[in-house]
Amino acid sequence: MDNRVQIFDTTLRDGEQVPGCQLNTVEKIQIAKELESLGVDVIEAGFPVSSPGDFNSVIEISKAVTWPAICALTRAVDKDIDVAADALRYAKHKRIHTGIGTSDSHIKYKFNSTHEEILERAVHAVKYARKYVEDVEFYAEDAGRTDNEYLARVVEAVIKAGATVVNIPDTTGYCLPEEYGAKIKYLFEHVDGIDKAVISTHCHNDLGMATANTFEGIRNGARQVEVTINGVGERAGNTALEEIAMILKCHKDTDLYTNINTQKIYSLSRMVSNLMNMPVQPNKAIVGRNAFSHSSGIHQDGVLKNAQTYEIIDPKDIGLDENSIVLTARSGHAALKYRLETHGVNLSEEKLDKVYEEFLKLADKKKEINDDDILMLAGSERANDHHIKVDWLQATSGIGMKPVASIGLDISGEKFEAAATGNGPVDAAIHAVRQIIKKPVTLTEFTIQGVSKGSDDTCKVHMQVEHNGRIYYGFGASTDIVNASIEAYVDALNKFTAE
């Protein structure tokens, strides 16, 4: 059996299903190119039949990426497969990923069907997909809760029908590691012809066991893992690419390896976090802010003497360079451009000039500018295309006085001004915006997060608003909480006023 573990990245499909983290086609292409540079074997680019946006993204990613297989998801439905094949027409290496639910609950409640009918649909879908492409992956949705004997029948049948890869998803994140590993082992012991296909894992993190389950799958014979950058994904997320890659790199006694260039992990993690507006939790394994931080005096003493006393991973192995350029108000365009490019952010000269102007303003307030600061500045540049823009904002608040805010908006070139009071400066500023917009909008979620360490550092604000029964998300970043909040609120307003 091959000791190389293939990396199937589904950040752009399963990972993008997180509410508020949708990417446009340009952003998806940007991530896809970095995934190619990282060394992934397969990029699942989207679910083409689900929307014109996904269809177009698969087409454009197929054009932009050279050597990884480009995969398109479908249901076991002929039309889905037709559309997927069309979307993959420019891909150098095409894969169709089709499948159907196999657990008793899916068969009974989702499909109102029988085990035999589901088996027939699975075989038909694989054969139909093989008419278009040679590389067909079959997924047995909710395999984690599927009876092993029936699952083995399905796997054997789809391999005979032409499946080159068979995906065994723990769709609900229910399995225990030992249980999931035993399921993979059972398939290798009971499926005739299993050596003719690659067995793949796809684990969700609902009980915090996605990485452990994936590793047990590998130990028992799986040679493809389906993962996402930062573990992003529906509900509690998916297995994190960086965790599996570094587990295999650290535990060389397993004799298993990947083709991942681990030194590109950190920059891609930050890039995905920035483009998705989804912060990485500070204590996240491998890529979290605190992953290489030590607060205990005993730990600090040990690390200063020899890092191996408390660090099993060299930070440089994931692309963290202790000798990185320090950005200050004296830094020029070239330094800023270099630092952005190390995180996979490439801006036109015009946009770089605008980001540099904001960088200098921020640098006047802070002694040093960190990576999070410049990534926030680069991300906010995307807001320049909005037709509702904040010209100016003034908010006053203090002990014993009523918070007041005044604001000036530019709406498609027309100027508006308003003032309002509120329970605080943010509330007052939002009331002032509402006086101008005059649309029924309900603020349903409001989250403030400090990005860095100091009181003068950038904060990120995420807002969720409801308008006419639909949910819209907004994002803002600034060293000023009120400014960041209004930036997020206006960002959300631009989402539905553009429709």
Question: In which residue ranges do the predicted regions lie?
Answer:
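A mid-to-C-terminal "edge-of-domain" accessory segment
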Residues: 4-5, 11, 246, 252-419, ...
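Alpha/beta enzyme core
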Residues: 3-7, 17-42, 55-64, 78-199, ...
